[in-house]
Amino acid sequence: MEGSFSDGGALPEGLAEEAEPQGAAWSGDSGTVSQSHSSASGPWEDEGAEDGAPGRDLPLLRRAAAGYAACLLPGAGARPEVEALDASLEDLLTRVDEFVGMLDMLRGDSSHVVSEGVPRIHAKAAEMRRIYSRIDRLEAFVRMVGGRVARMEEQVTKAEAELGTFPRAFKKLLHTMNVPSLFSKSAPSRPQQAGYEAPVLFRTEDYFPCCSERPQL
């Protein structure tokens, strides 16, 4: 009978309308799962299924992955290329550490020179300026002494020219001899000379006082 559910007949209209969307949903889910399964399968399987050789590129991919893993990942037996790279990197790191240490040393020396050396050099420069001033005064003193000595030599030369120079031994010989008075002649009278005026000389004490006092140059 139409509309009876227990006899295995057709469902009522309301139940039939609810059952149709559920069936469509089930069919849609099954289609999605099958489609995802087909998309999850590798491209080599599709091409292999088409060409008749399933998974022909899989060994090649595995070998490539193993080669990259051997190069990049550490293993029990390191390859020569990896060992050479490690050695070069260690050498490079050592040189970088040495360079950084040298830079630190230079930075420390520069700061030491700026903080201690420059003030010391400035103080020495001021002291050298004082020494140069003393040297200038000493040179002026030497020139003054040279001028005084030159004037003294001129006066000595002039006195020798006026008084004459006679050997001392010959003078003694003449004093011991008795010459008759008739042979003696009156010595011509010499003109009276002016008195000797000693030149003005410097005093060393004025320029070089005692050791207890500081020299005044």
From Swiss-Prot:
Tell me one GO biological process term. Answer: anterograde axonal transport
Q: Where is the composition biased (Polar residues)?
A: 29-41
InterPro entries, sorted: Cappuccino
Q: Where in this protein does the record put region Disordered?
A: 1-57
Tell me if Nucleotide-binding is a UniProt keyword of this record: no
Q: What is its main location?
A: cytoplasm
Please list the residues that carry the modification Phosphothreonine. Answer: 165
Q: Tell me which stretches of the chain form a coiled coil.
A: 136-165
Q: Does the keyword Phosphoprotein apply?
A: yes
Query: What UniProt keywords apply to this chain's record, in alphabetical order?
Result: Coiled coil, Cytoplasm, Phosphoprotein
**Localization annotation:** Cytoplasm
Instruction: Kindly list the GO CC terms recorded for this protein.
Output: axon cytoplasm; BLOC-1 complex; cytoplasm; cytosol
Question: Would you say which domain of life the source belongs to?
Answer: Eukaryota
- What is the protein's known function? Component of the BLOC-1 complex, a complex that is required for normal biogenesis of lysosome-related organelles (LRO), such as platelet dense granules and melanosomes. In concert with the AP-3 complex, the BLOC-1 complex is required to target membrane protein cargos into vesicles assembled at cell bodies for delivery into neurites and nerve terminals. The BLOC-1 complex, in association with SNARE proteins, is also proposed to be involved in neurite extension. Plays a role in intracellular vesicle trafficking.
Q: Which family does it belong to?
A: Belongs to the BLOC1S4 family.
Q: How does it assemble?
A: Interacts with BLOC1S5 and BLOC1S6. Component of the biogenesis of lysosome-related organelles complex 1 (BLOC-1) composed of BLOC1S1, BLOC1S2, BLOC1S3, BLOC1S4, BLOC1S5, BLOC1S6, DTNBP1/BLOC1S7 and SNAPIN/BLOC1S8. Octamer composed of one copy each BLOC1S1, BLOC1S2, BLOC1S3, BLOC1S4, BLOC1S5, BLOC1S6, DTNBP1/BLOC1S7 and SNAPIN/BLOC1S8. The BLOC-1 complex associates with the AP-3 protein complex and membrane protein cargos.
Protein name as annotated: Biogenesis of lysosome-related organelles complex 1 subunit 4
The species is Homo sapiens
State which gene encodes it. Answer: BLOC1S4
